[in-house]
Each structure stands twice: as C-alpha cells, then as structure tokens.
Amino acid sequence: GDVWLDYGFPQNIVDEVEDHADTILEQGTSLLSFGGDHFVTYPLLRSHSKIHGPISLIHFDAHSDTWEDDGDRIDHGSMFLRAAREGIVVPEKSVQIGIRTQNNCTHGFNILHAPWIHSHGVQEVNKFVHDIVKPGDPVYITFDVDCLDPAFAPGTGTPVVGGLSTAQALGILHSLGDLNLIGMDIVEVAPAYDHAEITSLAAATIGHDYLCLLAKKEGAQERIIGTKLDEKQIGPTKV
C-alpha cells in the first residue's frame, strides 16, 4: 500500500520508503511502485539490493539523473550516481533509454539516446540491452514517464520533446520478459498537467504490461500480453 510520509521531516523519506519496501520484499514477492518524484527509486533500489545484491538498472528517462552532488541532497537529478557509488547498481550492466538532455559524464552507464532509438528502431534497442544485461543479472526497471514524448505524456514536471512513443516504449518493455526482473517503478506522472489523462493511461498500461511479463514468466500462456494469432489472422482482411 501507500507509504506514510511525515512531510515535516523530508530527511526521513529514504528510510521510510526503504523500510516499507523491506516489509513487502521480505515476503518473497515482487514490487511495482508508482510515484511521485523519481527520487523514490533510490530507497527502492536500496531495499531490492539487500535481497538481490548489485542490480542491473534499466532506466527509461529523458534525463540521466547522474549529476554530481555534495552527497547530502535528496534530489531526483543525482540519485543514480549515488546508487552507483554505493554499489547498489552496476553501471556497466545498466542501460539508460531515451535520454535527450546533456550530461558530459556517463559515469559508466550505457546510454541509448532518443535520436539513436528513432533512427535504429526498437529491435536494435532490444539487441543492445540483451548484449549488456545477461539472463542471470537481477534487473530493476525504472520508468520516468518523461521518457515519452510530450505528445504521448504531457502530464509530467520536466517534459522534453523528441521522446519515445508509447508504442516504442512498450515494444522495448515487452522484450525484457526473458530477463531476471526483480522490480519496477513508474514515476513523475503529474495528472494536473494533463486534462485528457493520456499520461495516466500510458503509465497504467506500462505497469499492466510489466505485471503481464511477470505472470508470463510464471507459466501463463500467450494470451497474457496479447492473443496468439494464427498466421492467417495476421495482415489486412479482405471484405
């Protein structure tokens, strides 16, 4: 359920979120979290790493979130650098997808910029990810909705044009089902900025399809992601 936070003491947020996640993960289950500010991923990663060890991070975003800081900030722009320095995530086995803002240092993360994705296509993205992340690596997915182009997700705090479409994002997500998925979060949805609620629909669909991937790994049938079609059913229908 929801994490109870005392907004008068923001310095306690990391421990409060981490402790709440611990109580769920200790039951041997998986966690899908929704935010909120992207910083929430940091305590979630801390909790998951207690069980799974160093993590391969698959990070959908317009921003790298690896800016240098003084080590004391609670900030959504630097938490992945902190996670890497603490050994929570392994940059060399992690991939950042959809980046289209400037950061002069990768800090070892593998980056797929949005323009590259547009020119090479989803299949090349999937190949790149599987060359970096191996089936046995514990994989955590974090999806900042501003990875999507504002045409598909206007309801977010820091939109950047030139992003992925929902079709591209879902195509990449669906390819990750053969990896060792340990958890996911979907963050930075701001419904007040989107009266048509297409951002919320995109986030809900991404979360739904992630759960379908988990269910499929547990032995469910093809109908989980979509009905399995006979070859005769694929393509245009003659009237």
Language-model regions, residue ranges each:
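Conserved alpha-helical scaffold segments that buttress catalytic/binding sites
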Residues: G1-V239
